A protein has these predicted regions:
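Glycine/small-residue-rich loop that forms an oxyanion/phosphate-binding "nest" at active or ligand-binding sites
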Residues: 87-108
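Short active-site oxyanion
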Residues: 40-43, 61-64, 85-86, 153-155, ...
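RNA substrate-binding interface of SAM-dependent RNA methyltransferases
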Residues: 57, 88, 116, 121-207
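Boundary-proximal intrinsically disordered activation/regulatory segments immediately upstream
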Residues: 6-73, 160-161
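Short, aromatic/basic amphipathic alpha-helical patches
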Residues: 73-84
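Short, structured interface segments
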Residues: 106-116
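Short, hinge-like loop/turn segments at secondary-structure boundaries
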Residues: 81-83, 107, 171-176
Length: 207
């Protein structure tokens, strides 16, 4: 049963519904829809209830949220986990215009990239997977999901698709949030040099 008192406060007293597709926050979400690379941003975008749940399960929190009234009605308990100041109610049409999901289920969020920690070189018994220039986002996401199920502790990425890109996140089913990773960018020689340096650091801690 919906807590009508909670919902009334949520809608009437706390938030201002966004109905314009030209709203600045909506435009910011839309920039990720156009394919902006997460490596050039301070934030990345996640879409859908499942990824939101996985983000929270991993101990991380969103910075900005777009959500429909319908979603709030259906997910009252989950919505209570968010700081009210982060929530921005939008119409279903506005949400659909802002994100890449064809049939969005009612929620999307921006997350600070700094909230996703890099791997720390302090454990000699870690199980580390090294991926060399995996370009296909679907394959990258599947590898993250499989690695998590297999007990991998961290992933080193020598270029390739960015793990915080939309297609990788969807394919990983949120596994990216649970696996620390290091990504090495640049020309081939720079990537190899950075990777070898990191492997050397592992050796120094007894790996």
């Amino acid at each position: 049963m919906v807590d009508n008192k909670f919902f009334k406060i949520l809608i009437e007293n706390t938030f201002l519904k966004i109905t314009s597709k030209n709203n600045n926050l909506v435009k910011r979400f839309r920039s990720f829809k156009r394919g902006s690379s997460p490596k050039d941003q301070d934030f990345f975008c996640i879409e859908g209830t499942h990824l939101i749940k996985e983000l929270l399960k991993s101990g991380k929190n969103p910075s900005k949220i777009l959500v429909t009234e319908k979603w709030l009605r259906k997910n009252q308990n989950l919505s209570k986990k968010f700081d009210e100041s982060l929530i921005n109610i939008v119409s279903e049409e506005v949400l659909a215009s802002a994100i890449s999901t064809i049939n969005p289920d009612g929620i999307a969020a921006l997350v600070e990239i700094s909230a996703i920690p890099n791997y720390q070189f302090n454990r000699k018994d870690d199980f580390i997977l090294v991926l060399d220039r995996i370009q296909d986002p679907g394959n990258m996401g599947n590898l993250f999901r499989t690695a998590l199920a297999a007990g991998v502790n961290a992933i080193f990425l020598a270029g390739g698709a960015h793990p915080l890109g939309q297609k990788v996140l969807r394919a990983s089913s949120g596994a990216v949030f649970h696996l620390p990773f290091l990504r090495f960018d640049g020309i081939e020689e720079e990537i190899l040099s950075s990777l070898l340096k990191s492997l050397s650091e592992l050796s120094n801690v007894g790996f």
